[in-house]
């Protein structure tokens, strides 16, 4: 993930968003299966780490400080992304639905990012307005992110304990 000069939580999360957007763009134009697989694996790693630090650190700090509907939707959107990530991880380029799964994940993430980054009413704007200590949160998130990247690179990504729409057992 991109390094930032600050430990601000929102800046860190936005940098993650930009990185993943770039990876999705590269996937869209990739031709070779080996390149598609490498990009999809990187997308899944980046999103899994990002989701984990949001759910473990940022979202709990936002609880009660932002609109409940926005907070709830963020968790549900993460659940959908986790299922799609597990599907992508279980497959390979050339498999039926593989490219479609990456495309749908990209669309889900674009929607999620839009909800978080909306100028006035998005999650990040509401968190700032509520006075969250984004520097302290960011420092904690950056440390957790570093540890998770090392862990997931060594042992693989965690799988959600649900069957997918194609019947793949994900746990």
Show where each model-derived region lies:
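Small-residue-biased structural context
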Residues: 1-171
């Amino acid at each position: 993930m991109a390094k930032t000069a600050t430990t601000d939580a929102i800046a860190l999360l936005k940098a993650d968003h930009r990185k993943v957007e770039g990876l999705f763009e590269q996937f869209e134009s990739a031709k070779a299966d080996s390149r598609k697989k490498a990009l999809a694996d990187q997308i899944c790693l980046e999103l899994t780490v990002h989701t984990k630090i949001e759910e473990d650190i940022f979202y709990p700090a936002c609880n009660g400080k932002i609109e409940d509907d926005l907070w709830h939707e963020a968790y549900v959107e993460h659940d959908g992304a986790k299922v799609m990530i597990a599907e992508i991880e279980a497959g390979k380029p050339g498999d039926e639905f593989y490219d479609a799964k990456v495309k749908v994940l990209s669309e889900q993430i674009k929607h999620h990012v839009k909800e978080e980054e909306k100028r006035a009413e998005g999650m990040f704007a509401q968190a700032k307005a509520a006075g969250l200590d984004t520097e302290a949160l960011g420092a904690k998130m950056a440390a957790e992110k570093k540890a998770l990247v090392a862990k997931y690179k060594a042992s693989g990504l965690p799988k959600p304990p649900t069957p997918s729409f194609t019947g793949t057992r994900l746990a």
